[in-house]
């Protein structure tokens, strides 16, 4: 009788363990249908909060992609330098926040096809007549967001380190610092600057042509699972380009199509 009771207890315990394993697999399958995406939530007009809701060009592009591949989105908001770290450690699947495709980043990540094109642009005070190109920045203090491709593009154009580059954790405060003379200039995406100058009404202007043009795409870790996911996203982007969604979203935010390669 005791042996029977013991057998029943063992079987019950095994069933409980198997049940738990089953639940774990179910949860994993649920997670397989979730795309973990990073953004700053402060990058107007690409990924920012409006009335407490995350929105912007990059956000809407990613939402359209997720709908095409039938996946849910889990957004994680961090400073840009922190986003790249989370992607590298596998805590994020990708980033939807104007990540430029660079040779350095391609060593670590696989990128999707580009969904936009960006130019690193200099912005100065409206009454500034001294700065017209990157050569005029020597001896000047120039703001840039830490870890951004725009900061790196500026550094690449300054091999002798004659430009004093002042880095910021976020975009917040950069334009005001230029307008109030606390820094001489600021570098960011041309489209971002056009939108921000219009939104803020600050006395600023673009100085010269963009110093670098780059593709913007979604980065993924270099492993089989993420490569499979990347290929799904590529297919979705092809469909969104073909049906006009990418162009429509671009014109909504910029009054121009930044999803096609710039001729320069």
From Swiss-Prot:
Stimuli inducing this protein: More strongly expressed in the presence of methionine than in the presence of sulfate.
Quaternary organization: The complex is composed of two ATP-binding proteins (YxeO), two transmembrane proteins (YxeN) and a solute-binding protein (YxeM).
Role of this protein: Probably part of the ABC transporter complex YxeMNO that could be involved in amino-acid import. May transport S-methylcysteine.
Protein name: Probable amino-acid-binding protein YxeM
Lipidation (S-diacylglycerol cysteine): 21
Originating organism: Bacillus subtilis (strain 168)
PROSITE patterns tied to this protein: PROKAR_LIPOPROTEIN (PS51257), SBP_BACTERIAL_3 (PS01039)
Entry annotated with the keyword Cell membrane: yes
Keywords for the protein's UniProt record, in alphabetical order: Amino-acid transport, Cell membrane, Lipoprotein, Membrane, Palmitate, Signal, Transport
Pfam families for this protein: SBP_bac_3
Cell location: Cell membrane; Membrane raft
Lipidated residues (N-palmitoyl cysteine): 21
GO terms for cellular component: membrane raft; plasma membrane
Cleaved signal peptide residues: 1-20
Recorded topology in the membrane: Lipid-anchor
InterPro entries (alphabetical): SBP_3_CS, Solute-binding_3/MltF_N
GO biological processes: amino acid transport
Family note: Belongs to the bacterial solute-binding protein 3 family.
């Amino acid at each position: 009788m005791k042996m029977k009771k013991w057998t029943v207890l063992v079987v019950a315990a095994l069933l409980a363990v198997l049940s738990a394993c089953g639940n774990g697999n179910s949860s994993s399958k649920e997670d397989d249908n979730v795309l973990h995406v990073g953004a700053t939530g402060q990058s107007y007009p690409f990924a920012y909060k409006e009335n407490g809701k995350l929105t912007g060009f990059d956000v809407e592009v990613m939402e359209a992609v997720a709908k095409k591949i039938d996946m849910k989105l889990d957004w994680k908001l961090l400073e840009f330098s922190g986003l790249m770290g989370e992607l590298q450690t596998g805590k994020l699947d990708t980033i939807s926040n104007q990540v430029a495709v660079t040779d350095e980043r391609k060593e670590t990540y696989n990128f999707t096809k580009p969904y936009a094109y960006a130019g690193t642009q200099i912005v100065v005070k409206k009454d500034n007549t001294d700065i017209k190109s990157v050569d005029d920045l020597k001896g000047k203090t120039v703001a840039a967001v830490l870890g951004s491709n725009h900061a790196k593009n500026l550094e690449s154009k300054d091999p002798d380190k004659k430009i004093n580059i002042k880095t910021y954790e976020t975009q917040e405060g950069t334009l005001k610092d230029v307008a109030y003379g606390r820094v001489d200039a600021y570098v960011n995406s041309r489209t971002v600057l056009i939108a921000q100058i219009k939104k803020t009404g600050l006395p600023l202007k673009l100085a010269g042509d963009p110093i670098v043009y780059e593709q913007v795409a979604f980065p993924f870790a270099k492993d089989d699972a993420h490569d499979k996911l990347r290929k799904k996203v590529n297919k979705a982007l092809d469909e969104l380009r073909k049906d006009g969604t990418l162009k429509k979203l671009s014109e909504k935010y910029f009054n121009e199509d930044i999803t096609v390669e710039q001729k320069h």
